[in-house]
Curated annotation (Swiss-Prot):
Upper lineage: Eukaryota, Metazoa, Ecdysozoa, Arthropoda, Hexapoda
Gene (name only): Cyp6g1
EC number: 1.14.-.-
Name of the featured protein: Cytochrome P450 6g1
Top-level enzyme category: oxidoreductase
Any GO CC annotation of this UniProt entry: endoplasmic reticulum membrane
Organism: Drosophila melanogaster
Binding, heme: 458
Top-level division of the source organism's lineage: Eukaryota
Names of required cofactors: heme
Amino acid sequence: MVLTEVLFVVVAALVALYTWFQRNHSYWQRKGIPYIPPTPIIGNTKVVFKMENSFGMHLSEIYNDPRLKDEAVVGIYSMNKPGLIIRDIELIKSILIKDFNRFHNRYARCDPHGDPLGYNNLFFVRDAHWKGIRTKLTPVFTSGKVKQMYTLMQEIGKDLELALQRRGEKNSGSFITEIKEICAQFSTDSIATIAFGIRANSLENPNAEFRNYGRKMFTFTVARAKDFFVAFFLPKLVSLMRIQFFTADFSHFMRSTIGHVMEERERSGLLRNDLIDVLVSLRKEAAAEPSKPHYAKNQDFLVAQAGVFFTAGFETSSSTMSFALYEMAKHPEMQKRLRDEINEALVEGGGSLSYEKIQSLEYLAMVVDEVLRMYPVLPFLDREYESVEGQPDLSLKPFYDYTLENGTPVFIPIYALHHDPKYWTNPSQFDPERFSPANRKNIVAMAYQPFGSGPHNCIGSRIGLLQSKLGLVSLLKNHSVRNCEATMKDMKFDPKGFVLQADGGIHLEIVNDRLYDQSAPSLQ
């Protein structure tokens, strides 16, 4: 009798749960929005859940479904939560710029207790806290401040040249390597010095602390993939499931390192116009008014900004550099043109480039911009709709007779936009000429946004671009790159990654041909 009652309760609970999911999964059909039929319980995240495809590339596949080519939006289900993929350019502009006050938060979240550095950093922080810290950090990233950082970056550029030279000498002038790792060592050292005033020495020691923790951060193991999956698709469960964007050991490392640097900076009174100066200033500002609430009274809030600056700063630049070198190896004629432009400028500058000079290199800029089109590091943007008190909710008219509901997640498929033949001729072809001065005017603004758009765009885009350019200049100064047996013929992306990463890495041969060293004396 008891067993029968237990079975009845279990069956009833399962039926109720199934009915609830089915009810949720009929939402878009009931609202008259075109949608992709969901899988029971897990919605439209089956391939992501099984780690068969990354979410960014899955969004791209949905975007490119021929049945949906004329639709402005597509309804999907993030597990049981109804969400929207935005296809129309004007709607994207509305979300990111015009109606930003309704979409100022990301849908993804972190656990405020188990992962305070994840919860409090500029990427994830919400509402008024986001606006406050964004305003305080913006002065670090002005063109004037970035120009001041360039001299420090150049020192790391020289370290990269020497590291390549040492490896070449050990291998008769050429060697095969996974190029992303070298690029990550460079960008790690660069970010550490320009943001924190620390010599990370990753180029000298690939297992140095900063590089070791950075490598772990973006190595998408099953456990890391699970953390990102829950943070982006089940954000309400991050606390229950103890999800960590920043792992416990990384958080400990950042607290110890940044805390020490801040204390030393306060003790010495040294000013470097870097991120640490801003964090020290915020802490002093909070201490000056002890009776008033201030987010900087929370040390983790300050360390969180350093943590996200470091991780985002090295990953974006190293990815851009490695994808650029992959394309240069595939297109030797483009590589020659780029190296000739770099070499001519280096000869003119006596072996180095001023800030103004590197920014003036036209073909270098074209190559980097095209790399960011084909390989946007963050292949999608996520936002959460928020109703505004006293105002009607946002309508999707004239496209659909539907009004957004509070808490609805929306996804902007950046990779898909960057590869849409509606906006790009032969989008799968690597063609820097798209970004020539003559052709740049033809680009549809919202169809190209490697750093996002509007108030929530990437605050460090200037640094990221400059760092990528300097890294390429330093590497190509006396070295060429070419394909080897391990080089992928066609790029495949890691299906576990939430940022765009080559599956298995990018293996290239680096050849020390001493282009600059041989040409400089004869042209002086």
